[in-house]
């Protein structure tokens, strides 16, 4: 399938999510992407299945600390020298507890509700598949009307205060979909960031970067 997409001249990017079942394949996945000249991104955090109130399948999840180590290893494999230097400078800034950058207070840094949307199986339009409460049935208002209101809805979302002012905010993948709350910070992501920073520091000390 990938070969056919490339032959057709279509832009291609690999998005990977690592779980207990494929974490050991990370180096091979990255090697495949490099050998074929395909950009690759890693997602190490699995969102809880919010839409139907289902319990998360813990058999797929890795502990936040392991996600952090995987994230550091992935970045070490995929970043060039300049990117690694900038990342080291960023981590040093975080350790000095510099304040978060002003634009990092947004509750979602992705394109949800601004350049991307979801349509559910039952015809609801959502700005993000993990924010079902912000959606509405397409039959009631139509796409244009619902889409026009998504930007305002996303801007109204708020992160917990501890997240908005956290020095790690520039590194952390936290967003409104992760927290589902304007009060409680996601403790798992705090552990993820700590593990990531420790792993990057160890690799730098050992000359792995």
Q: What are the functions of these language-model segments?
A:
Residues 1-113, 118-126, 130-135:
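Radical SAM enzyme [4Fe-4S]-AdoMet core and its adjacent flexible, acidic
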Residues 104-107, 129-209:
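Flexible mid-to-C-terminal extensions adjoining Fe-S/redox cofactors in radical SAM and related proteins
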């Amino acid at each position: 399938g990938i070969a056919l997409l490339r032959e057709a001249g279509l832009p291609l990017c690999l998005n990977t999510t690592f779980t207990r079942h494929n974490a050991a394949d990370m180096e091979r996945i990255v090697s495949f992407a490099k050998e074929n000249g395909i950009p690759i991104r890693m997602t190490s955090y699995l969102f809880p299945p919010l839409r139907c109130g289902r319990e998360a399948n813990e058999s797929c999840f890795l502990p936040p600390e392991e996600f952090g180590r995987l994230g550091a290893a992935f970045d070490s494999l995929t970043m060039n020298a300049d990117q690694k230097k900038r990342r080291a400078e960023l981590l040093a800034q975080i350790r000095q507890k510099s304040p978060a950058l002003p634009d990092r207070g947004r509750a979602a840094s992705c394109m949800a509700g601004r350049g991307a949307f979801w349509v559910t199986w039952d015809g609801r339009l959502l700005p993000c598949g993990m924010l079902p409460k912000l959606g509405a049935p397409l039959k009631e208002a139509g796409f244009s009307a619902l889409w026009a209101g998504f930007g305002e809805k996303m801007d109204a979302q708020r992160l917990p205060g501890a997240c908005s002012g956290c020095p790690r905010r520039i590194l952390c993948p936290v967003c409104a979909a992760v927290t589902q709350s304007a009060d409680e910070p996601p403790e798992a992501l705090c552990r993820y960031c700590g593990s990531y920073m420790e792993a990057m520091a160890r690799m730098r000390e050992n000359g792995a970067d």
